[in-house]
């Protein structure tokens, strides 16, 4: 007669359990249960309807492995777990890890309180990883009360073939073919209250391996454990939150531009002539005027026609500094002149608006003959209104320095040019208005080889940039076809009543109460309480 026998295979009976049984056909089968994943902690979920909604499972979920080996011994036998034709399920129960001394009055509810909830039974899953075997997984087990417990798993087998039945049934209470095989227990674990629970841990590699093969296991990644060492005040928590958000302000980088020197050693140098400017030219500077005929090889070059000759050796006023000089104020371009300078006559000094040097110097241009020189016919340029006269920038007369025209800018170098410029609309033909002089930061590379630009004569003014259309009026509100509101129709019900007043009957107005209408008129009441009058047709059929 073959009966199940419990055999301890290791020093720890809580980790691996084996039994041996002999079937009706004298087959020697070995059952080996191993708890691969032990539970470590749990949170007490309590009792009641609220406990079912906020229930935390035992962490990590217990995983039990089953192997069936056929042979005279485990070492010499063959693993037939996948070939054995039977059904297995594992039932979990909870028990106290420490013995509890009970009182004198004891009853069934006190001895075995129902504190384990969830799904306590699990069927066997045949998995290939981590090894080919049968696995029982318990992802939904919870404990209602806090304490120190351990889980006990009972293995039940439902044999399908009669040849695999036992020689004699071990338990007569179970139906034929259903047998209890063995039991294994886990290591003790703590069940914490909601306040003391440290939190769920990150899922183990075994849980992830089992979940990858289709088993229902909750996977948690990047779990943040709660710290309950010390509970600071609300002010401390706000300070910590602010410290986490606060970032270190980077140190300001050193300014690559050095400070302006106060030396006057560069006053007698020639004006700076930039050969290659990296800045983007403005609209006036980027325009290239067509080449005009000139004769640089003539012995006597004519003076610039109909244009104020720039002052000789015009140093940029914004580069003058020192103790004996004051910072100049820039002015706009000078109004046009309709005459040329006489031959050999020096240019009269311009009266400055500020403390400028007034020493006069001979003109740097060579003397010319009085022969007229023309550039050909040129149509007049239209303008809306003559430009207001603007003061010419001051300059120092130095006969030894080359010619460099000044800028038309009437603002300091730190100002910013406006983004949009409103141009006047064109008008009838008016006399020619001279354009502003070139910028002080933009100098001519030669002395008199290029004729001055006349951009105003080549570029026509643009129309003013204004809004062409006004904003459209809002569309009228169209009737939606819905019903009118009750307060709109029966507005008399919304008025307050004082001193015993009563609501007026809207169907009997003051004007028609107790009055009889005319013979050719009729009265009718509308839905809003107003009394309407209709006049009948005098003609009768």
From Swiss-Prot:
A motif (Nuclear localization signal) lies at residues 40-45. It is found in: Nucleus; Cytoplasm. GO terms for biological process: sporulation resulting in formation of a cellular spore. This is Developmental and secondary metabolism regulator VEL1. InterPro entries: Velvet, Velvet_dom, Velvet_dom_sf. Pfam families: Velvet. Disruption phenotype: Exhibit early chlamydospore differentiation under nutrient stress conditions. Impairs gliotoxin production and induction of other secondary metabolism-related genes including genes encoding nonribosomal peptide synthetases, 2 polyketide synthases, an O-methyl transferase, and cytochrome P450. Impairs mycoparasitism. Residues 299-314, 345-355, 425-439 have a biased composition (Pro residues). Component of the heterotrimeric velvet complex composed of LAE1, VEL1 and VEL2; VEL1 acting as a bridging protein between LAE1 and VEL2. Residues 230-244 have a biased composition (Basic and acidic residues). Component of the velvet transcription factor complex that controls sexual/asexual developmental ratio in response to light, promoting sexual development in the darkness while stimulating asexual sporulation under illumination. The velvet complex acts as a global regulator for secondary metabolite gene expression. Controls the expression of the gliotoxin gene cluster. Plays a key role in mycoparasitism.
């Amino acid at each position: 007669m073959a009966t199940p026998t419990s055999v301890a295979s290791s020093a720890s009976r809580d980790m691996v359990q084996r039994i041996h049984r002999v079937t009706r056909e004298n087959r020697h089968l070995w059952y080996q249960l191993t708890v691969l994943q032990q539970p470590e902690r749990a949170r007490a979920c309590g009792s009641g309807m609220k406990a079912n909604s906020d229930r935390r499972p035992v962490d990590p979920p217990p995983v039990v492995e089953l192997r069936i080996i056929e042979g005279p011994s485990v070492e010499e036998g063959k693993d037939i777990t996948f070939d054995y034709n039977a059904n297995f399920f594992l039932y979990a129960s909870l028990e106290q890890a420490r013995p509890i001394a009970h009182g004198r009055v004891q009853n069934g509810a006190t001895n075995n309180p129902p504190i384990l909830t969830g799904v306590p039974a699990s069927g066997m899953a045949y998995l290939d990883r981590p090894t080919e075997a049968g696995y029982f997984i318990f992802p939904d087990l919870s404990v209602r009360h806090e304490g120190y417990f351990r889980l006990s798993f009972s293995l039940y087998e439902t044999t399908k073939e009669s040849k695999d039945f036992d020689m004699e049934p071990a338990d007569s209470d179970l139906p034929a073919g259903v047998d209890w095989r063995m039991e294994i227990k886990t290591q003790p674990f703590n069940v914490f209250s909601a306040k003391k629970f440290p939190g769920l841990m990150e899922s183990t590699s075994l849980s992830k391996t089992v979940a990858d093969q289709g088993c229902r296991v909750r996977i948690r990644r990047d779990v943040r454990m709660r710290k309950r060492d010390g509970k600071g005040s609300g002010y401390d928590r706000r300070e910590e939150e602010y410290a986490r958000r606060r970032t270190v302000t980077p140190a300001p980088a050193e300014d690559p531009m050095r400070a302006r020197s106060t030396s006057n050693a560069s006053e007698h140098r020639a004006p700076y002539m930039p050969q290659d400017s990296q800045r983007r030219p403005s609209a006036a500077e980027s325009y290239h005027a067509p080449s005009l005929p000139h004769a640089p090889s003539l012995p006597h070059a004519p003076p610039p026609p109909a244009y104020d000759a720039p002052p000789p050796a015009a140093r940029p006023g914004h580069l003058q500094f020192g103790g004996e000089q004051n910072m100049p104020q820039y002015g706009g371009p000078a109004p046009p002149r309709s005459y040329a300078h006489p031959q050999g006559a020096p240019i009269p000094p311009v009266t400055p608006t500020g403390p400028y040097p007034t020493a006069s110097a001979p003109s740097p241009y060579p003397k010319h003959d009085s022969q007229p020189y023309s550039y050909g016919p040129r149509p007049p340029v239209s303008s809306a209104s003559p430009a207001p006269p603007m003061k010419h920038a001051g300059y120092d007369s130095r006969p030894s320095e080359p010619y460099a025209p000044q800028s038309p800018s009437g603002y300091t170098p730190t100002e910013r040019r406006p983004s949009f410029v409103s141009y006047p609309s064109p008008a009838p033909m008016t006399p020619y208005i001279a354009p502003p002089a070139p910028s002080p930061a933009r100098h001519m590379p030669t002395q008199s080889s290029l004729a001055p630009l006349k951009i105003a004569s080549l570029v026509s003014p643009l129309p003013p940039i204004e809004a062409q259309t006004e904003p459209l009026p809002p569309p009228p509100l169209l009737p939606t076809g819905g019903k009118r509101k009750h307060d709109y129709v029966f507005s008399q019900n919304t008025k307050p009543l004082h001193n015993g007043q009563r609501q007026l009957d809207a169907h009997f107005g003051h004007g028609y109460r107790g009055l009889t209408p005319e013979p050719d008129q009729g009265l009718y009441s509308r839905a809003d309480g107003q009394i309407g009058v209709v006049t009948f047709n005098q003609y009768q059929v």
